[in-house]
Amino acid sequence: MKQTLREVIKDRIIILDGAMGTMIQQYGLEEDDFRGYRYRNVEGMMKGNNDMLNLTRPDVIEDIHTKYLMAGADIITTNTFSSQRISQADYGLETSAREMALEGARIARKAADRYSTEEKPRFVAGSVGPTNKTCSMSPDVSNPAARELDYATLYEDYLEQIEALVEGGADAVLIETVFDTLNAKAAIDATMEVGRRTGRDLPIMLSITVSDLAGRTLSGQTLDAVLASVSSYPIFSVGLNCSFGADQMKPFIKELAHHAPYYISAYPNAGLPNSLGGYDETPETMAPQIGEYIDEGLVNIIGGCCGTTEKFIAKYAETAEGKTPHRPQEKPRTMWLSGLELLDVTPDVRFVNVGERCNVAGSRKFLRLIKEKNYEEAVTIARKQVADGALVVDVNMDDGLLDAREEMRTFLNIIASEPDIAKVPVMIDSSKWDVITAGLECVQGKCIVNSISLKEGEEVFLSHARDVMRYGAAVVVMCFDEKGQATTYERRIEIAGRAYRLLTEKVGMNPLDIIFDPNVLAIATGMEEHDNYAVDFIRATEWIKQNLPGAHISGGVSNLSFSFRGNNYIREAMHAVFLYHAIQKGMDFGIVNPATKVAYGDIPADQLEILEDVVLNRKADAAERLIELADQIKQQQEALKNGAAAGGAAAVSKAQPEWRKEDVAKRLSTALVKGVAEYMEEDIQEALTAFPKAVDIIEGPLMDGMNTVGELFGCGKMFLPQVVKTARTMKKAVAILQPYIEADKKEGTTTAGKVLMATVKGDVHDIGKNIVSVVMACNNYEVIDLGVMVPAEQIVKKAVTEKADMIGLSGLITPSLEEMVNVATEMERAGLSLPIMVGGATTSEMHVALKIAPIYSGIVVWVKDAAQNPIIAQRLMNPEEKARFAKELDEKYARLREEYAAHQKKLSSLETARSNRLDLFG
């Protein structure tokens, strides 16, 4: 009987295949090959849609699988990376997506079975790509709440794809090139549903791609935050692919190997793309690097991504032969939560304070702001809580006059674009389950659901618990059942024990993901039966810690002092005393105001005695004495207030950040780098008196800030959400300056120039292009965005009809380089000489110098990052600067061509010498 993948991986290192796209390019396929007879009349360009070859040239795909199997691959990956409706919509082939997935799996299954033996079984991994859209980021910098793709749509598309892959014979599901963990969650969710429907145990293989030198995903998460996000799921393996070669990828693989409780996979590119978009690593140079992974015990699965072929895989198989595989880490013994960063709830954390102020039921100010749709100011409340030390931010939108689902989605989407807030996990708080699920579908990190209970019985309770697990969250469990809210110690522990058994035994929830709320209730209310509420909570906390292993305890602390509304000092002092005692007994979460000013150790001894008598219910007259104390303090505060007013005391101003002490130019630059728009209006008004023209402010301090952003992003010290935030700040600055700029202009034009943006034909990636478009628009350029997969003919036509001043070409994949040359050729043929700016992951200055500039009479300039575009565009729009720039580029390109020729000559001489070497053993 054939061994399963789960069995084989325990004994040896598994060999995965290499790149599919690289291999397909070697066949020199043309448009007709992709179309076949079936798609001969479909509009648009089909070349580059590799997945459709499963239907039109299955012989090519089977041949590629065969080559990898012959090279020693244990797992071959289906040619279905983009076989989802979302991805195929770019080609108008949505209705063929399922068939592509089905046939892709069948082709791979047929090839694998032909080579599979009892000694060396071969497996098929169904490839599931991330699509070219993201659930976690806005496509519109001016509207951070917007999303181009929602979780529910993506889930349904993935469900269709994965069902087809399993039907076609896939042994496992490989969710690869993950750049947004929320997209990955949808794929995991769909895989688990297919497993339930089919009764199959489907290994879930997760492969992430990091986008910068800091090791973050494109959506901003660190690798340990990603691990936390998926920690509730039955992941088989986790690893990295794409972005880097083996050498650059190694530190991140080490990080995963040291933290992940899963098998580790790595399939790097054949090095980094060279100046021509190719890859310089060979099987012989890559194998030793892969050998380091293996010898250091870092990996269980090894393969190749962009630029690798069957020759690489053959070398890897030789290198891995007989070597010991990586031993996965133990499952974490502490709770993992995450936003953009990990929150590991270790004993050292002691207490997780959950910020309570983003709650429409608990903050009148927050409610007012949400009702007014003043999200910008509402966000500052969340930001202040994090700055004050909140480790989690609670969000509640339950108000009768609000559309709670829509407001929850909107606010969570907005704070996801604020890195200084999004770094911490969120607590999605609602009494309505549809609001909870709406929130869960917006969050890429591992959040907390607040809450579920047995109020409606076990069936509803278990259904809600399964939803929590489906979305990979932790959960607050209220001590509330069919009989009502638990108010005594006995009822609290009865409900907690029952709920714990149901969650761990019936739905298999990890106890570490369970947070009990034994109900913090108001004390000192004047009703004797309420006096022991705090004591019973603390006793229940101790019992839960001793009897329900792994579980945590939380509570809404402000409920305790409800009777003393209006006297903040007494309320905060009560909370401090309560938390001091509850934390000692095991309370490790609490919904609190992180800006509280009263600490337990700062309370005067005489006050502390009264407060502890109340909280611990030590004396019958404690409540009366606390009321007297509250009155005394209130009178003292009023006297101080009246005295200050009579003496004309100046209002205490809010502390300003250090950078606010700099001159206005420096403040503007720093505000951009930090993405802080709060002071923009006042700073620009001051700058208008210091600079001759409004546009000088853009070209001076604002562009200085954007340059710094570009440099920080380039060296991995900023990540994409931060860059987008700075772009949004820039846009606000430009909007403030716009009336002044228009007033300065003599001819009434309202733009700095018109730029035509396009991702070239054959490439469906648009994130980089979108960022450039935003940055250009922020710098007062009119942007005509043609989208993705744009043929050269359309670019030329639009350049003429739109009277563009320049063209921006974007491309992420290697074939895009050839297409950029084609665009320049078509521009030249049409008699156009508009400046062309090119950018994207595979582009380079050397490629421009060697391939594009020589065939185009206009200026062609390579742009390293988004922040450089407006700087270059400014030079192109100034006739004198443009001529000077053209001369600089001509000289630079001539020098690069000479360097390249000299390098090639040196290589040629080396090859000649090797071929003429003396054969001593002939």
Language model: regions and residue ranges:
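Domain-level signal for soluble alpha/beta catalytic cores
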Residues: 1-922
